[in-house]
UniProtKB/Swiss-Prot annotation:
Functional description taken from the UniProt entry: Catalyzes the oxidation of 5,10-methylenetetrahydrofolate to 5,10-methenyltetrahydrofolate and then the hydrolysis of 5,10-methenyltetrahydrofolate to 10-formyltetrahydrofolate.
HAMAP family found in the cross-reference section: THF_DHG_CYH
Binding site for NADP(+): G165, R166, S167, S190
Keywords, sorted A to Z: Amino-acid biosynthesis, Histidine biosynthesis, Hydrolase, Methionine biosynthesis, Multifunctional enzyme, NADP, One-carbon metabolism, Oxidoreductase, Purine biosynthesis
UniProt EC number: 1.5.1.5, 3.5.4.9
Pathway: One-carbon metabolism; tetrahydrofolate interconversion
Taxonomic placement: Bacteria, Pseudomonadati, Pseudomonadota, Betaproteobacteria, Burkholderiales
Any Pfam family hit: THF_DHG_CYH_C
Subunit structure: Homodimer.
PANTHER family, per database record: C-1-TETRAHYDROFOLATE SYNTHASE, CYTOPLASMIC, C-1-TETRAHYDROFOLATE SYNTHASE, CYTOPLASMIC-RELATED
Protein name: Bifunctional protein FolD
Amino acid sequence: MTALLIDGNALSKTLRAQAAERAAALTARGHQPGLAVILVGANPASEVYVRNKIKACEDNGFFSLKDAYPATLSEADLLARIDELNRDPKIHGILVQLPLPAHIDSHKVIEAIAPEKDVDGFHVANAGALMTGKPLFRPCTPYGVMKMFEAHGIALQGANAVVIGRSNIVGKPMAMMLLDAGATVTICHSKTRDLAAHTREADIVVAAVGKRNILTADMVKPGATVIDVGMNRDDAGKLCGDVDFAGAKEVAGYITPVPGGVGPMTITMLLINTIESAERAAAAA
């Protein structure tokens, strides 16, 4: 058996076209969706992510604003800028690129963003709303994974799902979304005693820890769906995920590649969240 590839680029293209249509409709009514992205410091990876987000906005009819600050920016000044953006009616989404310099409390910064503009879905109010099954925004990466399941008709109700990783950005919200869809969910992490015992029983495995080959072919149930959220480099410097792709694709039923799998979906769902925020603002105007 060779797994069917879940192509994040193709699905992302379709969803971005839909987002562009919604953006055009809003703009025609005088409510162009707007996203503000804040970058503090000169982290090369963060600069690439921010550039990709801004380009996605420009390509799909969104207004975008990039604030780039030196790593010496004070926490107080960053919080003051967020307050300004909270009150700016042209801005429907505010994103602070993580990680932040050590002297800035990222939790305090995230909580400073107005929940109705927290398009990353990280604010405690939005995390709590997700927990209760009534989310205002869903964190972009797990939201994108759910869209992948939907697009490929992968049944979640009654499925055994394992999420490897417990971060607030991917692991925990991914588990909640799967649970809300009717899956039986197990969260595994660095303290899990026998990871393979869990994954071999799973119909769905989502690997999201940032560790190469955390999931190998012998750990995959035949026909399972394997979602690789990891972003790593192999010994040759080539981009790879958390899954041993070459081995796992011979056992799994569906699998996402790296690159070209989950990655493109993350920015796409950021656009979708921003559109939803703009539509709510327009309806309330």
